[in-house]
Amino acid sequence: MNALLLLAALSSQITFNTTQQGDMYTIIPEVTLTQSCLCRVQILSLREGSSGQSQTKQEKTLSLPANQPIALTKLSLNISPDDRVKIVVTVSDGQSLHLSQQWPPSSEKS
């Protein structure tokens, strides 16, 4: 097995399942954990564009199973080319587990 694939399989991670139709983006953050946990999930959405700024924050506590991707929420956003959008998802058990991931990745335009 490829070492990179093995490393990904052995580590907890947050990924984003994203689809786009025109300016409409559907973003589904998913978490895969190596151990089940009762975790605090925070989803922060920041947007800045010609019509102003907005910020939304969702927080919830979820019982997350191990070794399977779990969709945390579904976001549908109309993002015009001049908009700057950042979504940050954080999953923490308050002890040893703390994951955070941003969409879009910093290498993409935000």
Curated annotation (Swiss-Prot):
The keyword Signal applies. Gene3D superfamilies: 2.60.40.2420. InterPro entries: Curli_assembly_CsgC/AgfC (IPR053722), Curli_production_prot_CsgC (IPR014491). Residues 1-8 form the signal peptide. Transmembrane segments: none annotated. It is found in: Periplasm. GO terms for cellular component: periplasmic space. Keywords: Chaperone, Periplasm, Signal. Its main location: periplasm. This is Curli assembly protein CsgC. It comes from Escherichia coli O1:K1 / APEC. The gene is csgC.
